[in-house]
From Swiss-Prot:
GO terms for cellular component: cytoplasm. It holds the Pfam family FMN_dh. GO terms for biological process: isoprenoid biosynthetic process. InterPro entries: Aldolase_TIM, FMN-dep_DH, IPdP_isomerase. Substrate binds at R9, K10, S95, T96, H97, Q154. GO terms for molecular function: FMN binding; isopentenyl-diphosphate delta-isomerase activity; magnesium ion binding; NADPH binding; oxidoreductase activity. It catalyses: isopentenyl diphosphate = dimethylallyl diphosphate. Belongs to the IPP isomerase type 2 family. Keywords: Cytoplasm, Flavoprotein, FMN, Isomerase, Isoprene biosynthesis, Magnesium, Metal-binding, NADP. This is Isopentenyl-diphosphate delta-isomerase. Its main location: cytoplasm.
Amino acid sequence: MSDFQREQRKNEHVEIAMAQSDAMHSDFDKMRFVHHSIPSINVNDIDLTSQTPDLTMTYPVYINAMTGGSEWTKNINEKLAVVARETGLAMAVGSTHAALRNPRMAETFTIARKMNPEGMIFSNVGADVPVEKALEAVELLEAQALQIHVNSPQELVMPEGNREFVTWLDNIASIVSRVSVPVIIKEVGFGMSKELMHDLQQIGVKYVDVSGKGGTNFVDIENERRANKDMDYLSSWGQSTVESLLETTAYQSEISVFASGGLRTPLDAIKSLALGAKATGMSRPFLNQVENNGIAHTVAYVESFIEHMKSIMTMLDAKNIDDLTQKQIVFSPEILSWIEQRSLNIHRG
């Protein structure tokens, strides 16, 4: 594939993603908090700091991996980096493969560090990159963490995608053992299972982003790029973010879990934190805001999102993220069926 074709693909991904709409039905709507009328705390008591063994985020919300690798996406990364700088959010760039192949493309990613020199930035590579390239991706952005995206459904629907996956787990193990910053194994909208969590724990993984279905749909994106558009029947493939978080429950004491995929509102973010996530990521909402409304409007959107999270936590009488994990939740019969059929041990305060 030529550099021009790769740039074109990056732009196509963004164009199709922006045209997608939120799923009409979300598993976040299938779980409810129990309301108690009189809180014992004030809004100013709320501490939204997200603390993991290696990373401290001011807020448990981050701009998730999206793009880079073309002039248009450079402009997007530049604007998102300014939003991150002005709001204190962490930010992940999209796959840096384009920059690792062609130094001319490096600036489409490094612009994020240039615009946000003191901020928390995650670099991003695929599960098949050599260890040396993973190290290079971290150095490229002076990144505080490295996301490794695992995206087999996307690759298989992508006309020019990868068809070989046997080496992925061993390669991830090698990267985890060599890279000095936290390595986050990140799905891309298809969710995670307890079996995967077991496999990742065995090779020393300490961070995952479950990225469940319901947000940006890479099966749909790649199917749009197919000549016959003949794989749309896979559109609903995978686990939702709620199901994925429930799948991780037994591993949350050993692995820091981040949640993304279909988060629409501050309430969805709070529900994710209540299910054990340490932080929540969003891609398309930030992309649409910054492209359609500009930087200032997106900064205001983030500030409002954070304030709404504080209001919800006050209603729940939860001073911090840890408190949220003890709050009572009522699940729908469908989610309870998933828990039962998957033999998940869900214990709450």
